[in-house]
Amino acid sequence: MKALLPWGMMLTALPSLAGAVFGPGVCYDVGKGSYSADARVKDTPDTVLCWAASSSNLIQYWQDTYLKPHAQPNTPNGMNAKVYGEPQGTRYLNVYEQFLKSSTGDSGGFQADALNWWFKNAPMKELGGKEAYYSIFDAQPAAAEARSYLMEEPTLVQFREMLEKAFRFKGQAAGLYVWQINRKERPGTMPSKSRFHAITCWGYETNASGEPSALYLSDSDDRTFGVFMVHVDRREIHDPFSGMSYPSIVFYTDDDVDGYQPGEYEPNLHSACAVLTPESVAKPRSKPNATPAEAAQKNTLLPAGAKLGSDLLVGNGENSVLLHAEKLKLDATLRISGGSLASVDALSARQVQNDGKLYLHGGANAPGNVQNKGYLECVGADSITLQGCDNSGRLALRGNKAANVKGGDFRNSGTLLLCGKAGISFDKAALDSTSGTILLGQDANGCTPTELRFTDAEGRTLSVTSAPNAVGELHNVRITPTSIEGNGSNAVLRHVKISGNPKLVNVQLEP
């Protein structure tokens, strides 16, 4: 392994082994032990902010992957300009500096809590209720999953499943929380004043049985600043403090295969958090906690759980608009008018219940997790994609080039109007989730699609082409590459030209 800088290592320089999984690029070790000189911690050679240090590693690694295209000047990111000793010339992550400034004292904590504070402004007593920098992100809630293994007597297979989840996507690593039986310390580390300790896992290896056999860790109490390998095993351990014995996942170094020798690194796993899925991709926004009246500004945030009972216009149709809303209940009319940038969402909305009218103009993607019982209109300047919507009302999807519907969480029991000048695509999962009416073709705005493509799991397609200046309607119809199946007299295709010579079953065609 080759050190890139005192604060980072290239994982690609590690040996390539069968069964090895590494996070790509640079990993971080903020070396928080050097903060022992901080005036607030005068009587100890160590602080207990290892949870903040490990969380900083994870956050910076994720920001390197997803934040760069959207970085703002006030984003805590990269290295701090300060230079510290121990070792000489050390510099630290700005993310960790923010944790240090916000901390109310030398208090222990958990990585999962720190990550949720950073990305969601969730309360964390160790940070005294101070506001996080979360307001610069428009992100899904950080997927910081804390799971305690200490009392579960986990198997190696269960531990492997956690690791697989932690390293499934780019930009992910794992924060591990360990229980230091017999106060095992790796040489070169700051002596810990707590039996609990937070470390960062950057990769793992499995044996022929698929069980974890090694981990690649960084310990931010480590004065040597490096990624080191530990072996993994499941052993019966004895806790001298409680007098209890129980099986646990144990990490050990090469010199400690046969026993517990003082001065060697051998904690056992207490809990783990696999964090920050790629759905958490960051987009900048201006300020948190805007009231509905303030939401007409560019890049705004509605408070979580907001209820909008009066009409509201957001945007002027020229600038790009990003409205962030969680658990929004809409009983009135909300119009969001953005610019022509198809790469900017007009609305990033999660868990929105629309019983009124919601207009989204200027986005490339319709919002996910919307329950629409009223009228929802999504217009894309280029193409537009809809997924994750439960529509029992009337939903209009218009793309200046194409309109695409993806299945999965999509359900339609109401009316869906699709308009895409260059075509409309519907995957099979979306079609199978449709029991209502699909309208295609021109509407009051003169939007006329050239074709409607239905794609099955194998990628085969059947095109349904609308006649010129006509509106096609599909009522309770299921289309496959070889047949069109309907529900008796309720299955009607109107003003539609069908290509592909499919077999018609219980379907009525009207001119």
Predicted regions and their residues:
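Positively charged n-region of N-terminal signal peptides that target proteins for export
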Residues: M1-P6
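Predominantly the structural core of cysteine protease catalytic domains
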Residues: L100-T206, P212, Y265-H270, P284-S286
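Extended low-polarity, hydrophobic cluster-rich segments
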Residues: N57, R195, L269-V275, L417-C419, ...
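Extracellular beta-strand-rich, repetitive "passenger/adhesive" scaffolds
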Residues: P292-K307, L313-L328, T333-P511
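Active-site signature of cysteine proteases
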Residues: R160-M162, Y177-E294
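N-terminal signal peptide c-region/cleavage motif recognized by signal peptidases
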Residues: A13-P15
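Active-site-adjacent structural segments surrounding the nucleophilic cysteine of cysteine proteases
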Residues: A18-L127, D254-D256, Y260, S280-S286
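Intrinsic-disorder/low-complexity loop/linker signature
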Residues: K32-G33, R183-P191, G210, V227, ...
